[in-house]
């Protein structure tokens, strides 16, 4: 009997191609779309009514059943709520990480296993593997370096990886579009989504005010000597590396270096001051066997960043220190630092501060 796979369908070409690939491999495939929003004023965003309708049409075209799993309350609490609390604490979160952990490979996987499915699958550009020597399931980068999404999956557990199939990760984006076009899928040329789904216009301040009831509190811009340079509009309006929209007159370009929630200040400096050679991080997730000694890796602190050689040193309390061979620009509290050993994702953590 064919193994049963539940595919998370977003309405996009990658998840549709995922269905086609799994069908070719002989799996019994069903589709599911996660409802993330009750409202209809966010067309074209992940989990929207438009996505649900399109996913249903594409599923029917491929001859697979399709259902909708309502996770609106969980999404509001664990993703949108966490986004608000992190911003209010002076950090810059990546909500896609929370969505993958809590919804796609949390609630969706639990539902699938409870309803007789053997695996779940998504259209992520990453791969899964198994290391017989350690007995551990592995996460590997996708073969398309330009589309690789392993960075946002570093929190995967062994249980999740054991029930995960990622066929799209074996292909390039052009190959995936060609596969969908050959089948005649309506979404073969659908553009990739870019924005945070619940802040599609990029106005974080408005979202924090309307959803989180956050009223930004103005405070001081200061330099590294403590000198006040001007007034800011509230910590939530800024992130490390930002230059535009500061409203500060100076004889040189100024950038946001960091934010201090305790004192409600934003530290400004020149571009050279944005570079740091080390960081501290917590909430560590290891996919490989957790190391007891310093581990040589390549690492990156942003999704689109190139990796750099580094050493990860385990600390007391489950934290890590990461020392880079070359200084890194705009290391940002709240973002993820992800570690690689070749193509294998070793693990990752949430950045606490640059050193």
Question: Where on the chain are the PLM-derived regions?
Answer:
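AMP-forming adenylation/ATP pyrophosphatase catalytic core
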Residues: 39, 121-355
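ATP-dependent adenylation/nucleotidyltransferase module used to activate substrates
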Residues: 1-155, 165, 174-175, 181
């Amino acid at each position: 009997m064919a193994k049963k796979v539940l595919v998370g369908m977003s309405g996009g070409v990658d998840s549709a191609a995922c269905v086609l690939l799994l069908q070719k491999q002989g799996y019994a495939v069903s589709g599911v779309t996660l409802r993330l929003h009750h409202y209809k004023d966010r067309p074209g965003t992940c989990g929207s009514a438009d996505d649900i309708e399109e996913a249903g049409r594409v599923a029917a075209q491929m001859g697979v059943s399709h259902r909708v799993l309502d996770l609106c309350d969980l999404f509001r609490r664990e993703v949108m709520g966490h986004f608000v609390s992190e911003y209010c604490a002076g950090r810059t979160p990546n909500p896609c990480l929370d969505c993958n952990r809590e919804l796609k490979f949390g609630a969706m996987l639990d539902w699938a296993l409870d309803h007789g499915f053997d695996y779940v699958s998504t259209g992520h550009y990453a791969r899964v593997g198994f290391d017989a020597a350690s007995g551990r399931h592995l996460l590997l980068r996708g073969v398309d370096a330009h589309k690789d999404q392993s960075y946002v999956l570093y929190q995967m557990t062994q249980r999740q990886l054991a029930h995960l199939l990622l066929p799209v990760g074996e292909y390039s984006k052009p190959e995936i579009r060609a596969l969908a076009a050959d089948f005649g899928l309506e979404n073969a040329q659908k553009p990739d989504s870019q924005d945070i789904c619940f802040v599609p216009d990029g106005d974080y301040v408005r979202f924090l005010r309307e959803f989180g009831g956050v009223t930004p509190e103005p405070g001081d811009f200061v330099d590294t000597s403590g000198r006040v340079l001007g007034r800011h509009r509230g910590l939530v309006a800024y992130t490390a590396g930002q230059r535009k929209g500061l409203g500060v007159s100076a004889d040189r370009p100024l950038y946001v270096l960091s934010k201090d929630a305790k004192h409600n200040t934003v530290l400004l400096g020149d571009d050279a001051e944005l570079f740091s050679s080390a960081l501290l991080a917590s909430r560590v997730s290891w996919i490989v066997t957790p190391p007891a000694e310093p581990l040589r890796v390549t690492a990156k602190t942003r999704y689109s960043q190139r990796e750099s050689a580094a050493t990860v040193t385990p600390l007391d309390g489950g934290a890590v220190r990461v020392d880079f061979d070359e200084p890194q620009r705009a290391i940002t509290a709240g973002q993820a630092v992800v570690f690689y050993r070749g193509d294998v994702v070793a693990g990752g953590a949430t950045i606490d501060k640059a050193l």
